[in-house]
Amino acid sequence: MNYADIRPIDVANGPGIRVSVFVSGCTHACPECFNPEAWDFEYGAPFTQAEADQVLQALEKPYIKGLSLLGGEPCHPRNQEAVLDLVRQVRERFPEKDIWCYTGYLFEDLAAGKVGEHSRALLEQLDVLVDGPFVIGLKNLGLRFRGSSNQRIIEVRPSLERGEPVLWDETSVE
């Protein structure tokens, strides 16, 4: 897997101060995507253990709330294995930090294992999933942590337990 960017400080892609990893490679090709250069799977540089260590080091700071995964498409089958390895390392070392993931895929398809062999395992490591493609006709700049009204902010663990999406509480002060 390649990555487009690692931001050791990010306040736009989830609650609190976060570390964000932008992976390369996406096939959704959403019109007016904010990161179209990351559609190319070869864009950026290889994501190796050195980059994972950089992310882990950034997460050591006590004021960092968690990790956000964006793209590109973190849940694309070509990216799943590397993303899963990273989130497992984060979970092991920082169980108190939350992990958010932005994807153009739907929760239901990821949970059913319809999006690559690691989609369910990856989902099980996440706290929050922002799902659905960006749709320009549904763009709404007033939404928290997403760009269009079709996208959902989903609490992953209760959703997996119930077998249906449980939405994140947007009134949260985080």
Predicted features by range, described:
Residues 1-4, 17, 35-101, 105-119:
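Conserved Radical SAM active-site core
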Residues 82-91, 139-174:
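P-loop/Walker A phosphate-binding loop and immediately adjacent motor/lid segment at beta-alpha junctions
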